[in-house]
């Protein structure tokens, strides 16, 4: 019985860690979301099912916490903004 409880708790911890990630969300053109205000990014991240977000001042891009695994937080192709 104790082993079953340990396995259940370990599985819950692993699934919780694997289901959420932090990073810069990307749009359909593989571009980061530009920003000036934290509230815009927080709203964007929550819309994407994240926990919260803010505007990272050094690159003026939204950064999100707690995004689902299916959400893109890195891309291998260039941003195609304006094409």
UniProtKB/Swiss-Prot annotation:
Database matches in SMART domains = Knot1
Q: Which organism is it from?
A: Lychas mucronatus (Chinese swimming scorpion)
Q: What is known of its domains?
A: Has the structural arrangement of an alpha-helix connected to antiparallel beta-sheets by disulfide bonds (CS-alpha/beta).
The signal peptide here is 1-19
Tell me the protein's name. Answer: Neurotoxin LmNaTx30
According to its UniProt record, where is this protein mainly located?
Answer: secreted
GO terms (molecular function) for this protein are: sodium channel inhibitor activity; toxin activity
> What Gene Ontology cellular-component terms does the record carry?
extracellular region
Write down the Pfam families for this protein, in alphabetical order: Toxin_3 (PF00537)
User: Which superkingdom?
Assistant: Eukaryota
């Amino acid at each position: 019985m104790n082993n079953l409880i340990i396995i259940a708790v370990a599985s819950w911890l692993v699934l919780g860690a694997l289901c959420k990630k932090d990073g810069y969300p990307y749009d359909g053109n593989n571009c980061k979301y530009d920003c000036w205000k934290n509230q815009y990014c927080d709203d964007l991240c929550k819309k994407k099912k994240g926990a919260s977000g803010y505007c990272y001042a050094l690159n003026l891009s939204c950064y999100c916490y707690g995004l689902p695994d299916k959400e893109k937080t890195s891309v291998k192709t260039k941003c195609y903004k304006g094409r």
